[in-house]
UniProtKB/Swiss-Prot annotation:
PANTHER family: CYCLIC PYRANOPTERIN MONOPHOSPHATE SYNTHASE, MOLYBDOPTERIN COFACTOR SYNTHESIS PROTEIN A. The gene is moaC. Belongs to the MoaC family. Pfam families: MoaC. One of its GO terms (molecular function) is cyclic pyranopterin monophosphate synthase activity. Substrate binds at residues 74-76, 112-113. Keywords: Lyase, Molybdenum cofactor biosynthesis. It catalyses: (8S)-3',8-cyclo-7,8-dihydroguanosine 5'-triphosphate = cyclic pyranopterin phosphate + diphosphate. This is Cyclic pyranopterin monophosphate synthase. The keyword Lyase applies. HAMAP family: MoaC_B. InterPro entries: MoaC, MoaC_bact/euk, MoaC_sf, MoCo_biosynth_MoaA/MoaC, Mopterin_CF_biosynth-C_dom. The keyword Magnesium does not apply. Pathway: Cofactor biosynthesis; molybdopterin biosynthesis.
């Protein structure tokens, strides 16, 4: 298997996508943040002192998707045509599940943007709640769907 981000001399490079066709592309990523039940209850009730945790995390995730190429060296700057971050509060398992759907029409996919959006949304939740719960765990961040481009559809069984 050849790594596309490595040149003939073994050095890092940004892949040239100029000859690729523009296609409609979408990526879906998910992740979770586990916390104490009291923390989850307070997020749900809106009693975290720093403000509306999920609203801030949603905006942070969208901003992160838009700025992925500034954080991941070999990512291309992409015009994102849509980004949605959603949250599901799971009281039974004391966690918040996070989902990011990112869309574009372009020459390269938005997988890294979706993964970055989920990660930064989770980090934002952690940041806003760390004063009351330093035991939070961010985990299970993964790409679950990718469509468009030459490689077509990818779906992970979850």
């Amino acid at each position: 298997m050849n790594l596309t981000h490595i040149n003939e001399e073994g050095r890092a490079r940004m892949v040239d996508v100029s000859d690729k066709d523009e296609t409609k592309r979408e990526a879906v990523a998910i992740g979770s943040i586990y916390m104490k039940s009291e923390t989850l209850r307070r997020i749900h009730e809106g009693t975290i002192k720093k403000g509306d945790v999920l609203a801030v995390a949603q905006v942070a995730g969208i901003m992160a998707a838009k700025n992925t190429s500034h954080m991941i060296p070999m990512c291309h700057p992409i015009m994102i045509t849509g980004c949605d971050i959603s949250f599901s509060l799971d009281f039974e398992n004391s966690k918040i599940d996070i989902k990011a759907v990112v869309k574009t029409v372009g020459q390269t996919g938005v997988e890294m943007e979706a993964l970055t959006a989920v990660t930064v949304a989770a980090l934002t939740i952690y940041d806003m709640c760390k004063a009351i719960d330093r035991d939070m765990v961010i985990s299970e961040i993964m790409l679950v769907k990718k469509s468009g481009g030459k490689s077509g559809l990818y779906e992970r069984e979850v």
